[in-house]
């Protein structure tokens, strides 16, 4: 079972992503920045694999991978026009938006693993081997837990450096819940 990803976690990931990777289309940066500036939109954003199966999905790629630069899917229509997708996002703020990011080492990135959600729209028969799927989910859960623990440890160290007892206590409680 997957816990929901918070708006702040999604924003933090997008900031990290934009600082570490260059998207093939500049409009993609505009879209991600627009989404980050609206919490109500970020609540509807889901980072997934295979966004082409979603009712409303976007695929964005960085320069370091050999994938399509940009695609927007809505129902059974696909476009490479980023401006049309931007207008759709603006006009349909209440609809879920599924984003697939193609970048080098995506599956080894704990930052990405922390926000990656299961795509509920992938056809069931797409997975031929349930054992592989279960194993992948376990690896992903372990990776997320490790990332969260490391992040909390870093924040605890920073709180100690600042002599911030209140933040330290709060973070220590969070860490004990993860352990």
Curated annotation (Swiss-Prot):
Query: Which InterPro entries does the UniProt record give?
Result: IDEAL_dom, UPF0302, UPF0302_N, UPF0302_N_sf, Virus_scaffolding_prot_C
Q: Which domain of life is it from?
A: Bacteria
Coiled-coil parts of chain: none
Mind telling me which SMART domains this protein's record contains? IDEAL
Q: Which NCBIfam families match?
A: PRK03636.1 (NF002965)
Q: Which family does it belong to?
A: Belongs to the UPF0302 family.
Protein name, as recorded: UPF0302 protein BPUM_1989
The source organism is Bacillus pumilus (strain SAFR-032)
């Amino acid at each position: 079972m997957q816990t929901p990803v918070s708006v702040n976690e999604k924003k933090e990931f997008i900031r990290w992503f934009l600082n570490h990777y260059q998207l093939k289309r500049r409009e993609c940066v505009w879209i991600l920045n627009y989404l980050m500036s609206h919490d109500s939109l970020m609540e509807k954003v889901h980072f997934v694999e295979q966004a082409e199966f979603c009712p409303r999905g976007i695929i964005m790629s960085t320069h370091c991978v050999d994938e399509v630069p940009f695609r927007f899917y809505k129902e059974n229509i696909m476009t490479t026009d980023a401006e049309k997708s931007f207008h759709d996002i603006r006009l349909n703020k209440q609809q879920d938006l599924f984003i697939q990011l193609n970048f080098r080492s995506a599956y080894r990135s704990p930052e990405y693993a922390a926000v990656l959600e299961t795509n509920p729209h992938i056809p069931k028969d797409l997975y031929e081997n349930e054992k592989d799927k279960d194993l992948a989910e376990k690896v992903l859960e372990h990776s997320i837990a490790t990332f969260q623990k490391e992040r909390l440890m870093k924040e605890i160290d920073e709180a100690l450096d600042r002599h911030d007892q209140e933040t330290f206590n709060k973070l220590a409680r969070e860490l004990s819940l993860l352990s």
